[in-house]
Amino acid sequence: MNFQSKTINASGNAKTVKGDGEYLTAVMYLAPYKLSGEGNLCPMAELAACHKGCLNTAGRGKFDKIQEARIRKSRWFLRDQQSFMEQLDKDIDRFRTKCFDNGVKPVVRLNGTSDIRWENFQVPDGAANFFEEYPDVQFYDYTKIPNRKVKGIKNYSLVWSYSAANKKYMDYVSAAKSAGMNIAVVFRDENFPRKFLNYPVINGDKDDLRFLDPKNVVVGLKAKGAAKKDKSGFVVDI
């Protein structure tokens, strides 16, 4: 089942989870870091050194027309946030309705290639954020931003994104782990280790349903796009 809109898109088959029905994920892809030329949508990118090996160039992201579309969308968000939020609200609502009409559970990932604190963005109709507006939609993201105010938001799951670029960022990794967050790690080789950071490693490339992962695990992801050549510490060699 496919879903296309101006902000979020879903393609491919819904993922079947035994005993829990089917899920379909819609993702919003913006231009990460400073690629839009008008703002920084990944505030921790330089500290974590992930801007050069960003997964933005993986898959269809390698095509110029895809990058141009992400830049246009990002500039829209940065220049006219009100109209962008109104459109995003409409698109989430349409996606939600289509999923329910087809007996599928809707999942939305707003930070496909960005790291924005969506918990701080009020929805045009007055809701505190999209998570409050759509309690029957499951949201999730990866993040490198510490101390995000998401405690108590039951339908928003965050996974911490690892980098060993420097000690300061590693301190944030340790804090995230102590806070009980799962840790996503990009490995250069697809043969993931059994354990990393004293956590068992699961294969995060098998599906995108991070909110269903067990607690206290490392989510292994294979390096894609520009990340294949990364030497900053963002991508891990075993």
Regions found by a protein language model. Name each.
Residues M1-I238:
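Class I S-adenosyl-L-methionine
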